[in-house]
Amino acid sequence: MVSDAGTPAISDPGFLLVRACVEAGLEVTCLPGPTAFVPALVASGFPCDRFVYEGFLPHKKGRQTKWLSYKEEERTIVLYESPHRIVKALEECVNFLGADREVCVAREISKLFEQFVRGRAEDVLKHFQQTPPKGEIVLLVKGI
C-alpha cells in the first residue's frame, strides 16, 4: 500500500486492508515514511515522551465531548485539522480548555512554506483569524 498523502493507515481507512492481510495470513511489512504529526510534535517544543494522537476531530457529533475530554489531559494532544476549520478548532480550544492553554499550529511540514505558530490559544486564534492558513495542519495542545 502506497499513499501520496502521508503514511498509509494514519487518519485513513488503510488499516482495514492491513487487518484483512493479517487475517488472511499474509506478511505485512511497514517502511517508515512521512507522517506530519511526528516532526510537528518534535518541533512544537511540547513534551514528546507522552502524547495522544487523536487524528481529525469529528465534524459535528461528538466534537464538544472530545474537547471536554481534553480538559484534564496531561499528555500533549496531537490533532489533524483542515485549513478551513482551524479557526473553529482554535475557538473551541479557547472555549473548552481556556485562553491560556498553550498550542502550536504546524503547517505544511517539510514543504517550502513550513510554519509553526506557537503560543496561548487565544493569541494563536487571533493570528489565524487575521491570516487564514493554507495547506496541511497539525494542531498540538500542551497537556496540563
Positions of the model-derived regions?
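Class I SAM-dependent methyltransferase SAM-binding "motif I" and its flanking Rossmann-like core
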Residues: 12, 16-73
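Short beta-strands and strand-loop turn motifs
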Residues: 2-4, 50, 104-108
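A contiguous loop/helix-start segment that scaffolds small-molecule binding in enzyme catalytic cores
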Residues: 76-144
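Short, small-residue-enriched loops and turns at beta-alpha junctions
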Residues: 7-10, 59-60, 113
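General beta-strand structural signal in soluble alpha/beta enzymes
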Residues: 3, 30-33, 79, 105
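Short gly/pro/ser/thr-enriched loop/turn and capping motifs at secondary-structure boundaries
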Residues: 8, 35-38, 111-112
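Conserved strand-to-helix beginnings and helix N-cap segments that scaffold or border functional pockets
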Residues: 11-15, 64, 87-90, 118
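Acidic beta-strand-to-loop metal/phosphate-binding motif
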Residues: 1-6, 10, 77-81
